[in-house]
Amino acid sequence: TDLLSDNEIIENLIFISNGSPGKLIDNLEIWDQIPENIKHDIKYPLKNYENILFLAKHITSQLNLDQQEFLLDYMQRIWWKKTKNKMFAEILEGIKKNISSNLQPRISWEVGLLKVKLKDS
């Protein structure tokens, strides 16, 4: 399997918790609430354009905004470790900014993830 090991997941969750035990507990709870299909599909590289549209739909229909913001932080961490591509981090940060500004979350996810795929092609 190409899923991250439990140790890698914990390491990433600790990193995005910025050393705060309380934040780590919150992040562990959020991680456990995220459906497995979403956890699987956020791995870099993204599969294809159709998968990206389904991923955006699943994220926005199955996760609340706090969970989506957490997921973006997590994706920034795992994608940075894999690619060291600053542009991808900026795109993900842009999605987070858009959804926290109450712009259409699904469109924000679709456009952002499609940008990543286009830059990666």
Give the positions of each predicted feature:
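Charged, glycine-rich active-site and insertion segments that engage polyanionic ligands
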Residues: 1-121
